[in-house]
């Protein structure tokens, strides 16, 4: 549920599509606020949000199946614009008196749309009589239209590829405008929200900042607030927003578990204390964490140990402050979107994300989540709005367990220091080559393998370092970065020459899938 209220909202009803979040991203990129809700709770959300327009998502289901998801009748009774995408088009037709059938020629992948009529939906992008690339993914198709609808676009296997009831402002598209494979899709969605729904592009990070600050003040009142600062972008932006809202009522706690990148803890402390005058406590708990991890090779046990110790240390520090009433977390919108479950009946699974585990319950604190309505790219824009430097905002993702999961096998302080130095050199080489912003994530891994080498006149038996770099849009899928071999040669030479304990460097050329980005 929203922590703030937006009068000009688009409601996206999720029927279980894998790309529903992309619809929301495109609407947000048009500077319009939107929310995703599962079809099971769409009635309640429609009443609560009173949206200006509705978008119906795709679905893995068939409208011809008994009990298949439906849109609430209330949206068709409200007299507001509706856009149905793929399954959304089909269920809208079926619910309004048209017909949908299964078993016709399927369309998966690239297709070409022939524009039959001009429409506000196509304004500025497609004209009558032209042909355009779109992305299809459907097995069912509309075979007859409800009263009031006309065909405004066709494809070879979808005669009702785009339909419209211009009077009621109901539109249906059989293709997916939200994916990048429909080149003009983002503009089509902009046409729907701006021209057809009539919402002005007022959703900006400047406006969000003002509303979020006001919402935090209203929630917190005169209470005491603490924030677990990790050094990452999300927690940092959340902390700055909270500080702008409540000032000295906020104290940030940064737990240095000894698993951060080179000089990272000190850099974060300097930035927040000196540049932002933020009350910040740095806790050096590295001995405690590394001692508990010593020799542990199971990646899941590493994660659980780190999570448990973090809660213990944070709890101890919070008690030293006399406790707190509120805990700030950098939870993002994808973490809290309700996901649709078709296999478990009508139940809805809530994806939750807590940066600090069970702390709120254990310490009887209320959560303050000022970023829970934002996607990651919006958080970066908000960080810029708050004055965070580009060098910080654009940093590569870093896992919560830190270097512990980039050190397969047993963790020791010595191995962590070797890895930290190698990682710093690798990232330095990437920056010097001007490649940092072209790569989604890059890091070094210290393998639990030693190999024979020759350095000078002597024989060595030292660790192998693996280098990893991937390109990605969202981290869900990734391809390895295709370096020039000269770059890899230079990086490997520097690491071997400057880091005692490594005598061999390899490069990981695994994509995701089948591999994951991190090694553990």
From Swiss-Prot:
Q: Which residues form the GMPS ATP-PPase domain?
A: 203-395
Q: Note whether Kinase occurs among the keywords.
A: no
List GO molecular-function terms, semicolon-separated.
ATP binding; GMP synthase activity
What's the EC number here? 6.3.5.2
Q: Which GO terms describe its cellular component?
A: cytosol
Q: Where does the Glutamine amidotransferase type-1 domain lie?
A: 9-202
Protein name listed in UniProt: GMP synthase [glutamine-hydrolyzing]
The source organism is: Brucella canis (strain ATCC 23365 / NCTC 10854 / RM-666)
The taxonomy runs: Bacteria, Pseudomonadati, Pseudomonadota, Alphaproteobacteria, Hyphomicrobiales
List the gene name: guaA
């Amino acid at each position: 549920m929203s922590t703030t209220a937006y009068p000009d909202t688009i409601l996206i009803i999720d029927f279980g599509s894998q790309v529903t979040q992309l619809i929301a991203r495109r609407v947000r990129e048009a500077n319009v606020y939107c929310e995703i809700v599962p079809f099971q709770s769409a009635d309640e959300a429609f009443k609560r949000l009173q949206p200006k327009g509705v978008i119906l998502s795709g679905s893995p289901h068939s409208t011809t199946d008994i009990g298949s998801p439906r849109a609430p009748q209330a949206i068709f009774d409200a007299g507001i614009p509706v856009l149905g995408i793929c399954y959304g088009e089909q269920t809208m037709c079926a619910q309004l008196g048209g017909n949908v059938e299964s078993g016709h020629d399927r369309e998966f992948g690239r297709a070409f749309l022939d524009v039959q009529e001009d429409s506000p939906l196509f304004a500025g992008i497609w004209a009558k009589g032209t042909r355009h690339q779109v992305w299809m993914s459907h097995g069912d198709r509309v075979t007859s239209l409800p009263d009031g609808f006309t065909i405004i676009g066709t494809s070879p296997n979808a005669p009702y590829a785009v339909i419209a009831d211009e009077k009621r402002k109901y539109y249906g598209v059989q293709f997916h405008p939200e994916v990048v494979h429909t080149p003009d899709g983002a503009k089509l969605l902009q046409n729907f929200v701006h021209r057809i729904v009539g919402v002005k592009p007022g959703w900006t990070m400047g406006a969000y900042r003002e509303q979020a600050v006001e919402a935090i003040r209203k929630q917190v009142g005169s209470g005491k607030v603490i924030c677990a600062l990790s050094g990452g972008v999300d927690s940092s932006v959340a902390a700055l927003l909270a500080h702008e809202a409540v000032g000295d009522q906020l104290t940030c706690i940064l737990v240095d578990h000894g698993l951060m990148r080179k000089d990272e803890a000190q850099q974060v402390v300097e930035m927040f204390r000196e540049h932002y005058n933020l009350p910040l406590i740095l806790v050096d708990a590295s001995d405690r964490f590394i001692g508990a991890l010593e020799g542990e090779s199971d990646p899941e046990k590493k994660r659980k140990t780190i999570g448990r110790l973090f809660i213990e240390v944070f709890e101890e520090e919070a008690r030293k402050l006399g406790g707190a009433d509120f805990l700030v977390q950098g939870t993002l919108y994808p973490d809290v979107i309700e996901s649709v479950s078709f296999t478990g009946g009508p139940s809805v699974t809530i994806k939750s994300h807590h940066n600090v585990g069970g702390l709120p319950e254990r310490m009887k604190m209320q959560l303050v989540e000022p970023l829970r309505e934002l996607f990651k790219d919006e958080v970066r824009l908000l960080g810029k709005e708050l004055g965070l430097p580009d060098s910080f905002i654009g940093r590569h993702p870093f896992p919560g367990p830190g270097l512990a999961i980039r050190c397969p096998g047993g963790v020791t302080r010595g191995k962590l220091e070797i890895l930290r130095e190698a990682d710093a050199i690798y990232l330095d080489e990437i920056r010097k080559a001007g490649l940092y912003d072209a790569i989604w994530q890059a890091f070094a891994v210290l393998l639990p393998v030693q190999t024979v080498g020759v350095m000078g006149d002597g024989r060595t038996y030292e660790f192998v370092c693996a280098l990893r770099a991937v390109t990605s849009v969202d981290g869900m899928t990734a391809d390895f970065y295709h370096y020039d071999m000269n770059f890899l040669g230079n990086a490997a030479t520097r690491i071997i020459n400057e880091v005692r304990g490594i005598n061999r460097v390899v490069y990981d050329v695994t994509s995701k899938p089948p591999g994951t980005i991190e090694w553990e």
